[in-house]
C-alpha cells in the first residue's frame, strides 16, 4: 500500500475461534458475505462495513501485513502511530498483539509486536548504512490497573506512578528480538491476571507497550495497546476487589469511546482527563497521528450483546477524520502559532530612536529622503520573528538596518521656527535660500519639560547685520523668563534674536525681568509629618487630615487613655463612700423574713403559673403539675401551704422532700 493513500484511521474486525472449554459446537453469529471483498460482515441481520474483516481462519502474518506493516513505514518517517485491540475477554486480543514472550510460542503464532520490531530493525539497519545517521530504538511497558499506572520495567513495578508523568517511564534499549523477549517476559511476570467465568487467564489491566524511534530530526512512537475485556461485570462472576477491577476496566474503555466520539464530532475540548488510560495515550490520540483499531469479536451466541457493542464502537471510530503530521512539522507549526498580541507592531523602536533628538519647538528632526518605506511593516516583521524562516528573518534585519541608515536628521534653524510662528513664510523662504548648508553640529536638546512656547527677551549683544544668515541656537540661561504671549512662567529657554529678525517682526523686545526664585529645600514627607505633629497642642485630639490611619487611631487611643486616667483619679476620693453604700445595700435579711418572702413567691407561682411553668418547679412532674392546676381551678387559689399539703397528690414522704428541695416550712 502506498504511503500517500494510507488512511489515518483504519478499523479492522477479527473473529475469534471457538472456545474449547464451552464443550459444544454451534453456528457462528458472524457471517462474511461473498460480495464483501473482506471489508464487511453480518451479525444479527445487521451489516457492518470496515477497512478489513478477518475471519477466524486468517493467520497472524496475513493480519500483520494488511494492518500493521504500513504503520512501521510511517513510524520511521516521523509519525505517531497507535494500534489498539478492543473486545471482550477470550477473543484473542493479547494473542493478536503479541504480548506473550516470543520464545514461548511457535514462529507462525507471533503477534504484532515482535513482527513490527523485526521490520523496524531491518529498516533502521538499511538507513544507517546509507545515511550514517544514528537511530536508536527503545521500548517501555506500562500497565494500568484499577485506574493507576505502573511501570513494569522500573525498579518498583508495584508502585503506582503519577498519570501525568507516564511519559518519563523506564525505557530500555532494543537491539534484537532477544531484548524484546526479555522486556515482554519481565512485563508479563508483573502484570495482573485473574481467572473469570469467561476466561481462565483473563487480563485485569490495560497494557501499553511503546516502541520509541529516536534520531536527530524526530522522536516517533508506536503504541501497542492491549485493552482489558469489555464484558459486563455480572458475566465475570466476581465480587469484592475483583468486581472493582471490572468497574475500573469499563471506566477506561468508556473514556476511550468518549474520546473517539468527541474527536469524530469535531469538538474542541476532548475529555482526555476522564481516565488514566486516555491521559497516558493523549499524545497519540490526536488529530496528527495514525490510529488503527482491531475489534476482536466472539462467534458464540451467548456473547452476542458484547459482539454488537464492539462492532458499534468500531463504527463510531470509523467516523474519525485525522490529518497526520510529522513530528518536525508539528514543531514548526506550533512555533508559527504566535499569539496575536506578540504580532502587533511597536509604537516606537529603541534601535530607530537611539540617534534621534527630542521633539520640541527648537529642533524638529526631518528625514533626508521622503520616499522611505513605512516602519510599521518592518517592525511588524521584526516583532514576529518567532514564526519566520531564517531567510525571512535575515531580510527583516536588513530592512531594519537600511531604515536606520536612511533616517539621517537635519536641524531646522531657529529663524524658520520663529518666523513660522509669526506668519512670515515668504521671508523665511528667502532666508533659507541664502543660508549655507548645515554644519553638522548636534542640535541642543531642550529641557525636560519640552515647552512649545517661544520666549522673547532683550538682546544684550551689539547688532551685527553681517551675520544674518548665520545659524544660531541660544544657550539655556538659569533664570525664569516672562513669556510675552502668556503671563506665566515657562521653561527656562531664552533665544537671542538678531537685528534683522526684530526688523522683520516689528516687535520690540520687553525689558528683561529677572524674578529671583528662592530655592527651598524639599523636605521628606516623614520630616514634615513629624514637625506638624509636634506643633499640635498637648492633650487635644490631633487633626486627622492627611495622616495614616494607624497614626490617627494611635492619637485617638492616647487621648482616650488620658481622659480615663483623669476620671479614675477624680473618682478615688469617693471610693470609701461607695464601698460603704454597697455594704449597706448587701445586708442579708432576717431568716424569718426571707422564709416568708419565699413562701409568698411560691404561692404566687402556684396561683398564676400555667402547667409548663409549674413543671419547672423542682420536684413536680407533668402529672403533678396538671393535678395542681386542676385543684387550683376547683379551689380558686391556694391561700397557704396547708391547703397545698392537704392535696391528695402527695404520697408517703413526698411532701417533706418537696419542701426540702424548695426551702419551704413543712
From Swiss-Prot:
Q: Does the keyword Protein transport apply?
A: no
**GO biological process assignments:** distributive segregation; establishment of meiotic spindle orientation; female meiotic nuclear division; meiotic chromosome segregation; microtubule-based movement; positive regulation of microtubule polymerization; spindle assembly involved in female meiosis I
Q: Which organism is it from?
A: Drosophila melanogaster (Fruit fly)
Q: Which gene encodes it?
A: nod
Note the SMART domains from the entry.
Answer: KISc
Family annotation (PANTHER family)? CHROMOSOME-ASSOCIATED KINESIN KIF4A-RELATED (PTHR47969:SF15)
Tissues of expression: In adult female, found in meiotically active ovaries.
Function field:
Required for the distributive chromosome segregation of non-exchange chromosomes during meiosis. May be a microtubule motor required to hold distributively 'paired' chromosomes at the metaphase plate until anaphase.
Identify its protein family: Belongs to the TRAFAC class myosin-kinesin ATPase superfamily. Kinesin family.
Give every Kinesin motor domain span: 8-320
Additional note from the record: The nod(DTW) mutation is a cold-sensitive recessive lethal mutation.
Q: Which residues form a coiled coil?
A: 639-666
In residue numbers, the region (Disordered) covers 423-450
Q: Which annotated residues bind ATP?
A: 87-94
Any GO CC annotation of this UniProt entry: kinesin complex
Please give the name of this protein: Kinesin-like protein Nod
Q: What is the effect of changing residue 94 to N?
A: In allele NOD(DTW)
Gene Ontology MF terms in the entry: ATP binding; ATP hydrolysis activity; microtubule binding; microtubule motor activity; microtubule plus-end binding
Task: Tell me where in or outside the cell this protein is found.
Answer: Cytoplasm, Cytoskeleton
Tell me if rRNA-binding is a UniProt keyword of this record.
no
Q: Gene3D superfamilies recorded for this chain?
A: AF1531-like domain, Kinesin motor domain
Q: Which UniProt keywords apply?
A: ATP-binding, Coiled coil, Cytoplasm, Cytoskeleton, Microtubule, Motor protein, Nucleotide-binding
Amino acid at each position: 500500500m502506498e504511503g500517500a493513500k494510507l488512511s489515518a484511521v483504519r478499523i479492522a474486525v477479527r473473529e475469534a475461534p471457538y472456545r474449547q472449554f464451552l464443550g459444544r459446537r454451534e453456528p457462528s453469529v458472524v457471517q462474511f458475505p461473498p460480495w464483501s471483498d473482506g471489508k464487511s460482515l453480518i451479525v444479527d441481520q445487521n451489516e457492518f462495513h470496515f477497512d478489513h474483516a478477518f475471519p477466524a481462519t486468517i493467520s497472524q502474518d496475513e493480519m500483520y501485513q494488511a494492518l500493521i506493516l504500513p504503520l512501521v513505514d510511517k513510524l520511521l518517517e516521523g509519525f505517531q502511530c497507535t494500534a489498539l485491540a478492543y473486545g471482550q475477554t477470550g477473543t484473542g486480543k493479547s494473542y493478536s498483539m503479541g504480548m506473550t514472550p516470543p520464545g514461548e510460542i511457535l514462529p507462525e503464532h507471533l503477534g504484532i509486536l515482535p513482527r513490527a520490531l523485526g521490520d523496524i530493525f531491518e529498516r533502521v539497519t538499511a538507513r544507517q548504512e546509507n545515511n550514517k545517521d544514528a537511530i536508536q530504538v527503545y521500548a517501555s511497558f506500562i500497565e494500568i490497573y484499577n485506574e493507576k499506572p505502573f511501570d513494569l520495567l522500573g525498579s518498583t513495578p508495584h508502585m503506582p506512578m503519577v498519570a501525568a508523568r507516564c511519559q518519563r517511564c523506564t525505557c530500555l534499549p532494543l537491539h534484537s528480538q532477544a531484548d524484546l523477549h526479555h522486556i515482554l517476559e519481565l512485563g508479563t511476570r508483573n502484570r495482573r491476571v485473574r481467572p473469570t467465568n469467561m476466561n481462565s487467564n483473563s487480563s485485569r489491566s490495560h497494557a501499553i507497550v511503546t516502541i520509541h524511534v529516536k534520531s536527530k530530526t524526530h522522536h516517533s512512537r508506536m503504541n501497542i495497546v492491549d485493552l482489558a475485556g469489555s464484558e459486563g461485570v455480572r458475566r465475570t462472576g466476581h465480587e469484592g476487589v475483583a468486581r472493582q477491577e471490572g468497574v475500573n476496566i469499563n471506566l477506561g474503555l468508556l473514556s476511550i469511546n468518549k474520546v473517539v466520539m468527541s474527536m469524530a464530532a469535531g469538538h474542541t475540548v476532548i475529555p482526555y482527563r476522564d481516565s488514566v488510560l486516555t491521559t497516558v495515550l493523549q499524545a497519540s490520540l490526536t488529530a496528527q497521528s495514525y490510529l488503527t483499531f482491531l475489534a476482536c469479536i466472539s462467534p458464540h451466541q451467548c456473547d452476542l450483546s458484547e459482539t454488537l457493542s464492539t462492532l458499534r464502537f468500531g463504527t463510531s471510530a470509523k467516523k474519525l477524520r485525522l490529518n497526520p503530521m510529522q513530528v518536525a512539522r508539528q514543531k514548526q507549526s506550533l512555533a508559527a502559532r504566535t499569539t496575536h498580541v506578540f504580532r502587533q507592531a511597536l509604537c516606537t523602536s529603541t534601535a530607530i530612536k537611539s540617534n534621534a533628538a527630542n521633539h520640541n519647538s527648537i529642533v524638529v528632526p526631518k528625514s533626508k529622503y521622503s520616499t522611505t518605506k513605512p516602519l510599521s511593516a518592518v517592525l511588524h516583521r521584526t516583532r514576529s520573528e518567532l514564526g519566520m524562516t531564517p531567510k525571512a528573518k535575515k531580510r527583516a534585519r536588513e530592512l531594519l538596518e537600511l531604515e536606520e541608515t536612511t533616517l539621517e536628521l537635519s536641524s531646522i534653524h531657529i529663524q524658520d521656527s520663529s518666523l513660522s510662528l509669526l506668519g512670515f513664510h515668504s521671508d523665511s523662504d528667502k532666508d533659507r535660500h541664502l543660508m549655507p548648508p548645515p554644519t553638522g553640529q548636534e542640535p541642543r536638546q531642550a529641557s525636560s519639560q519640552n515647552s512649545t512656547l517661544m520666549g522673547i527677551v532683550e538682546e544684550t549683544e551689539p547688532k551685527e547685520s553681517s551675520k544674518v544668515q548665520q545659524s544660531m541656537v541660544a544657550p539655556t540661561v538659569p533664570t525664569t523668563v516672562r513669556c510675552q504671549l502668556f503671563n506665566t512662567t515657562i521653561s527656562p529657554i531664552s533665544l537671542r534674536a538678531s537685528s534683522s529678525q526684530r526688523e522683520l517682526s516689528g516687535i520690540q523686545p520687553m525689558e528683561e525681568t529677572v524674578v529671583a526664585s528662592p530655592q527651598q529645600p524639599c523636605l521628606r514627607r516623614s520630616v514634615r509629618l513629624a514637625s506638624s505633629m509636634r506643633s499640635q497642642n498637648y492633650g487635644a485630639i490631633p487633626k486627622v487630615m492627611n495622616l495614616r490611619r494607624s497614626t490617627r487611631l494611635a492619637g485617638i487611643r492616647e487621648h482616650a487613655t488620658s481622659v480615663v486616667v483623669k476620671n479614675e483619679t477624680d473618682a478615688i476620693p469617693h471610693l470609701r463612700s461607695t464601698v460603704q453604700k454597697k455594704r449597706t445595700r448587701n445586708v442579708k435579711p432576717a431568716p424569718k423574713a426571707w422564709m416568708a418572702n419565699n413562701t409568698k413567691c411560691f404561692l404566687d407561682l402556684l396561683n398564676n403559673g400555667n402547667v409548663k411553668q409549674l413543671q419547672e418547679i423542682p420536684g413536680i412532674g407533668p402529672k403533678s403539675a396538671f393535678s395542681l392546676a386542676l385543684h387550683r381551678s376547683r379551689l380558686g387559689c391556694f391561700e397557704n401551704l396547708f391547703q397545698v399539703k392537704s392535696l391528695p397528690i402527695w404520697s408517703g414522704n413526698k411532701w417533706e422532700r418537696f419542701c426540702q428541695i424548695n426551702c419551704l416550712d413543712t
